[in-house]
Amino acid sequence: MREAMALIRARWLTIGSYRAQLVFSTLGLFVSVIPIYFISRALQPMMASSIRDQGQEYFAFLVIGLISFAFINTATGALHASFSSDIGNGSLEAVLATPITIPSLIAGMLGQAFAWTVLRTMLLLVGATLLGAHIVWSKALAAALILGLTVMAYIPLGVIAAALVLAFRTTGPLPTAITGLSMFLGGVYYPTSAIPSWLAQASKAVPLTYGLRALRRTFIDGAPMSASAGDLAALCGFAIVLSAVSFGVFSMAWTYARRAGTLAQY
């Protein structure tokens, strides 16, 4: 755990050295909620009936979708980006010279990215609340648990992408395909009931479909977690199966990279 915290701190120090960029990025995110508000207001009459079981308010519906997508984007993209960067600048070799475990290495690489995503999420939620989004704050803990479970279903996919970087120095189209399909089929901008029936069937293979439905019912409607038991069970299934697959894939890629001596080369 200490090793992971040290990596997280080092990455925060690197980001903190670009203070102007950090400030403008933060302010830009806070302001970006304004056009989302006006767009959602314009579409509210059209969307109200299709989202009646997920809050009925399109502004809150859209904000929750964008927040969830930001987290899965981090889950699938942060790890392989860190490996690519650290191999390229030689810092991975230096880190591996220390007595760090692979779980600590992965946690350290992901920790800073998720901390930054949490900060951005809070700014977006505060801005949305100030503009009148209906958020049931008493369900914040339950919503965080649901979001965490959704992220746990996507982290294994990010680990597989990192394994591709270790073995082949490229992820190929995998991360883009995952995020693209999740955005298109997972219900980020619209409920899955609004898409053609054959695509709606395909959305059942996307973890975000279950995560967003449960999150909106809880954080917008104020429903208890038990109302989304089926969706939460599906997320647990995705997380368990994909974790087992990613462990095997990453182990093989790590062993191959060490034998080939390519961990310090890009």
Where are these regions (language model features)?
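Hydrophobic transmembrane alpha-helices and immediately adjacent juxtamembrane helices
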Residues: 1-266
